[in-house]
Amino acid sequence: MKLNKKERQKLLQQTISSTPFITDEELATKFGVSIQTVRLDRLELSIPELRERIKHVAEKTLEDEVKSLPLDEVIGEMIDVELDDQAISILEVRKEHVFSRNQIARGHHLFAQANSLAVAVIDDELALTAKANIKFTRQVKQGERVVSKAKVASHDKEKGRTVVEVNSYVGEEVVFSGDFVMYRSKQK
């Protein structure tokens, strides 16, 4: 039995609500309509496309996990975190990140991405950078994507310090590396 538009849209909302990662193609098959019809229904109902739904779910999950700073204070887009273990963020280098005369990224943006990731990976309400040993290994240009990966290297429970190693890449090439000694309030 074919559903009318109102019924289909109601079921579409329920389906996406319960299964946010369902594709338009899967929805079209489920409801026996074209992909374009599903897209028009989503548009009418103000339901974002799959990519935006995935991003929203990921942000909500990360927001619940990251304790040391609000997600909007992480420089770049945080895509993964396992507290006191590892984290990953992506920074798309845009016009506002570069020098106007040569389109080379300003170093403080790369440092800020790495430092905020080092803070975010700490499983504590308070995490501060006590010391950083950093190295820029190549210039980054406008339009490049910097993937920053943080890994907790060690804990000194007595001193309340955690060492976080951060490497930032454009493709396979390391463009920045740093060891961040992080102060934390809890001795975990």
UniProtKB/Swiss-Prot annotation:
Keyword Oxidoreductase annotated: no
SUPFAM superfamilies: Thioesterase/thiol ester dehydrase-isomerase (SSF54637)
GO BP annotation list: fatty acid biosynthetic process; negative regulation of DNA-templated transcription; negative regulation of fatty acid biosynthetic process
The UniProt record lists the keyword Nucleotidyltransferase: no
Annotated GO MF terms: DNA binding; DNA-binding transcription factor activity
InterPro entries: HotDog_dom_sf (IPR029069), Transcription_factor_FapR (IPR017275), WH-like_DNA-bd_sf (IPR036388)
Gene3D superfamilies according to UniProt: Hotdog Thioesterase, Winged helix-like DNA-binding domain superfamily/Winged helix DNA-binding domain
Record-linked CDD domains: hot_dog (cd03440)
Similarity section: Belongs to the FapR family.
Purpose of the protein: Transcriptional factor involved in regulation of membrane lipid biosynthesis by repressing genes involved in fatty acid and phospholipid metabolism.
Identification of the protein by name: Transcription factor FapR
Organism: Bacillus pumilus (strain SAFR-032)
Native organism taxonomy: Bacteria, Bacillati, Bacillota, Bacilli, Bacillales
Name of the encoding gene: fapR
